C-alpha cells in the first residue's frame, strides 16, 4: 500500500512543469522589514488556564458533587447500609449550594441584564486600560531602576 502512494506521488512530480530560475516580470523588491505594530490592549475573552494552588483545588472540591455521587454508586454496588448516609450528605450539599447561589450578587438579574452588565464592565476595563497606557506614555516621571 505504501508503495502505491509513493508511486502516485512520483507520478504527480513527473506531471509538474519544471520551475525556471528567472524572476517574474511584474515582481517588485520587498520593502525592508519593519517592527510589528503594537496592538491595542484587547479584553480577553477567555483567560489562559492557570495552575491551581492547593487551596483553590480544595475550595473547588467543596463545590463538587462528584465525590459524593461516586461514594453513593460504590455503596449501591456493595449493597452497603452507608448509602443512606451518603444520600443525606448529597441532599445537604444541594441545600448548601442553593443557599450559596441565592446570596450571589446579580442572581436576581435576567441573563440579558447580566450580559449587558458584563459588556458595560468590559467597556469600563477597556477604557481604563487605554487611559493607563496614555498615562504611562506621558513620561512625566522617571522610573528609578533598581
From Swiss-Prot:
Residues 26-52 have a biased composition (Pro residues). Keywords: Acetylation, Activator, Coiled coil, Nucleus, Phosphoprotein, Transcription, Transcription regulation. Residues 112-139 form a coiled coil. GO terms for cellular component: core mediator complex; mediator complex; nucleoplasm; nucleus. The modification Phosphoserine is found at residue 110. The modification N-acetylalanine is found at residue 2. Its main location: nucleus. Pfam families: Med9. GO terms for biological process: positive regulation of transcription elongation by RNA polymerase II; positive regulation of transcription initiation by RNA polymerase II; RNA polymerase II preinitiation complex assembly. It is found in: Nucleus. Residues 1-62 are annotated as: Disordered. It comes from the Eukaryota. One of its GO terms (molecular function) is transcription coregulator activity. Component of the Mediator complex, which is composed of MED1, MED4, MED6, MED7, MED8, MED9, MED10, MED11, MED12, MED13, MED13L, MED14, MED15, MED16, MED17, MED18, MED19, MED20, MED21, MED22, MED23, MED24, MED25, MED26, MED27, MED29, MED30, MED31, CCNC, CDK8 and CDC2L6/CDK11. The MED12, MED13, CCNC and CDK8 subunits form a distinct module termed the CDK8 module. Mediator containing the CDK8 module is less active than Mediator lacking this module in supporting transcriptional activation. Belongs to the Mediator complex subunit 9 family. Component of the Mediator complex, a coactivator involved in the regulated transcription of nearly all RNA polymerase II-dependent genes. Mediator functions as a bridge to convey information from gene-specific regulatory proteins to the basal RNA polymerase II transcription machinery. Mediator is recruited to promoters by direct interactions with regulatory proteins and serves as a scaffold for the assembly of a functional preinitiation complex with RNA polymerase II and the general transcription factors. PANTHER family: MEDIATOR OF RNA POLYMERASE II TRANSCRIPTION SUBUNIT 9, MEDIATOR OF RNA POLYMERASE II TRANSCRIPTION, SUBUNIT 9. This is Mediator of RNA polymerase II transcription subunit 9. It comes from Homo sapiens (Human).
